Amino acid sequence: MSTAIKAPTGKVYQTKQSPCEALKGALPCRFIFSGRSGCGKTNVAVNLLTRDRLFGKCFDRIYIFSPNAFADHAWEPVRAYIKHALKVDEKKDPCFFEAWDEAVMQQLIDEHGRIVRRQKRRGDTMLASAAFVIDDWIDDPKICHGANNPISGLAIKGRHKNCSLFLLSQKLYAIAPTIRVNSTGVLLWGCT
């Protein structure tokens, strides 16, 4: 018996990737953006999600969870992108959520997982991709540090459902260690 480690065989699945050399192969990702209020976290996230040379055209669905989802005008380019580029009717398929609701988030994650499983059963190799953006909720310990919260689930297992996580927080260490350890990228601005 050979002791050599062999790569698994089987179907190789892909997800759309950024044309930017520095971001190729990054998706699905688990990115943390951390810095004080007004430092540019939201603007960087908006640009990553909507610019074609970054992650624009990579996601089939984008979901924004923020207590300021409708009040913060910085999210308007994402709203326009979802409507015009992704052709999503927000009245039928909401993408912006102001109130924290774990059940709604988990339902969206599970639904995307079902879509990916159907694609795999059909034999598709290019899989649908979803981005979940959590802005200004992670500082609440009830949300971030719960045993079975959907944010931790995305950080640990989201890649299996082709889900990316973009987590925006003013306090890096308010983010649960499980989430920090599983991040694939961290952007920091004068953190606390």
Where are these regions (language model features)?
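Nucleotide-state-sensitive switch-loop elements of NTP-binding domains
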Residues: 81-98
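Residues immediately N-terminal to the Walker A/P-loop in ABC ATPase nucleotide-binding domains
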Residues: 26
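Post-Walker A helix-loop "phosphate-sensing" segment adjacent to the P-loop in P-loop NTPases
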Residues: 50-60
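Conserved Walker A/P-loop ATP-binding site and its immediately adjacent core
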Residues: 61-77
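Conserved P-loop NTPase motor cores
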Residues: 17-19, 29-52, 67-69, 99-192
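Short secondary-structure boundary/capping segments
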Residues: 78-82, 184
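N-terminal pre-Walker A segment at the start of P-loop NTPase domains
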Residues: 1-20, 69
